[in-house]
Amino acid sequence: MRLLPDETIEVKSPAQLATMREAGLVTAAALRAAVAAIEPGISTAELDAIAEREIRAAGAIPSFLGYHGFPATICASVNDQIVHGIPSPQQVLRAGDLISVDCGAIVDGWHGDAAVTIRVTPDAATAKSGQRALGTREDGEDPEDEVAGLLDACEGALWHGLAQAVPGHRLGDISHAIEQAARAAGPYGIIREYTGHGIGAQMHMDPPVPNFGRAGRGPVLSAGMTLAIEPMLVLGRAETLLLDDDWTVVTADGSWAAHFEHTVAVTEAGPWVLTSEDGGASGFARLLAGGRVTEASPRSLAAGNGQAALAGAIRTTGTASEGARHGI
């Protein structure tokens, strides 16, 4: 591992990236296990226990548990809770609820971090994201369903941002792509106070990765950098409040929120999504199928080693904004 001068951004060796990939796969498995258990009547504390068992069974360590005093393995944020919700036996899910599950794992000192948001249904496991082309709806699905639209918009914005994680691009290209995708999808509030972040030997590292900003600004990305990219969108205004537990972040107006996250490595072959089982191949394919990419030239989908490249520029325009602070 080395640090780039002036930017203090970790550049990992191939061996370190391989270990981060292991941490990413453990994180992904824990998320899958928790999501598979989601149904009306289950508590968020039960989901937390499922994720912790999955992580420890793999010989890994939960990243979040004890982090600055956080008391759980996952963040479970329901409805108007944006991020950092604390699992509780009293938080029992009901049909129609929206829940974000955020999870991290450590393998040999290296971190993975990912999150997904789903709607709680009688068969909630089949309602999770990733089953259809991004930006499309299934036959019979109400096109006015604002929650479904919110989920599509947030996950789509994530993959637009991930697609910019290639050598030679700037950090602002990621932020800009997320913002433009979100704004194109609908009148959603884009959370500014909480952002993505660098990740590696620590869960939160430089640089912060805002979900808004100008293209062509910020540090130049190079192979070996790793980032946790995590857009947060809301149905209403983007103002937030911190609850008395000093962790849970909610919307000030009570509107519902969505949060998606992946850990990605910048490689010469393109973005390698470390917390995606196939390295990001299916996610980028869905992005293209959804028709949201204005200009893209895929140069590699290296299924053999799990690296997915979506090269070429995804060209968008937008307004400038300021940086923000990062959280889990």
Enumerate the language-model features and the residues they cover.
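Active-site neighborhoods and metal-handling regions in enzymes and metal-associated proteins
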Residues: 1-328
